[in-house]
């Protein structure tokens, strides 16, 4: 199997990679039977609010959490969510950066 490098396919545009990852997560949540919407509270947007059988899951998707600004943005999206449903940040980072009750998971 030949190696394909992300930059060769997408160029240096990380936003495109984020969109591909968001699409993968969206399709997977639909496959699992969730109703999937985009959340918005104030000026912050949550990538996906997934609901099934009265349960809810909040998801943020990022390629990498490489800078403090990215970490603040992705985890900060949940700042105004006041319920206790699970909140996840998904990325390709291989080490756990969970914080403040928000779980970080590797997207693979």
Locations of regions flagged by a protein language model:
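A cross-kingdom feature that marks ATP-driven nucleic-acid transaction machinery
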Residues: 1-108
């Amino acid at each position: 199997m030949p190696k394909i490098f992300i930059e060769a396919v997408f160029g240096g545009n990380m936003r495109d990679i984020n969109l591909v990852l968001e699409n993968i997560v969206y399709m997977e949540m639909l496959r699992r039977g969730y109703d999937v919407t985009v959340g918005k509270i104030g000026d912050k947007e949550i990538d996906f609010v997934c609901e099934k059988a009265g349960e809810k899951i909040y998801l943020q998707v990022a390629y990498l959490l490489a800078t403090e600004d990215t970490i603040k943005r992705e985890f900060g999206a949940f700042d105004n969510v006041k319920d206790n449903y699970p909140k996840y940040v998904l990325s390709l980072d291989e080490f756990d950066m969970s914080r403040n009750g928000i779980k970080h998971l590797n997207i693979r």
